[in-house]
Amino acid sequence: MWGGVVSHELELRFNSPTVNLWFKPDEFIRFLKRLKYYLFECEMQSDANRSLECGYPVGRLDDIHVYFMHYDSFEQAKRKWNERLQRVNMDNLYIVMVERDGCTEKDLAAFDKLDYKHKVVFTAKEYPQFHSAYHIPGSEEDTDSVKDLCLYQNKFTGKRWLDEFDWVSFLNERSLS
């Protein structure tokens, strides 16, 4: 969700098919480990049973489930996926993950080892052993999970939790400060 919000705020076109959807953490890491395979060799298929369970469209790329929570139909989700897939620049990737939805320390370690120069994982606490980890104090939903970073911190400031991260520097300098 954050990718769409940040892209919208910075007036950037959605150049990733992963905008407005989510993956389970272990499946997201598997997706990233074989990104070209999942993006360019797999056909997005509907998972009708999981869609019924979730109440929104769920797709499948081989062994990866893709949760399209902001779409009304699988057809609409697949159309947007394929449209944005054509815009992917494999030489200009920014990878973002959030410690939630069952994310484990093992998942964080696996994410940290991924061979991407421009990556960040927002975490519920400090993890000094992981270079890609970034903790926003107060953003914890509980001890093992980060709340929705698109939520406003309070009704007075107009600041969202994601505003505590310097997105412009991350996108321009391509590294964590």
Where do the PLM segments sit?
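Short, conserved loop/helix-junction motifs that constitute active-site signature segments
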Residues: V88, A109-Y116
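Short, Lys/Arg-enriched charge-dense amphipathic segments
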Residues: K36-L39, K119, V146-D148
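Short, low-complexity, polar/charged sequence segments that are solvent-exposed and flexible
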Residues: K113-K117, G138-E141
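Generic alpha-helical secondary structure signal
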Residues: E105-K106, F165
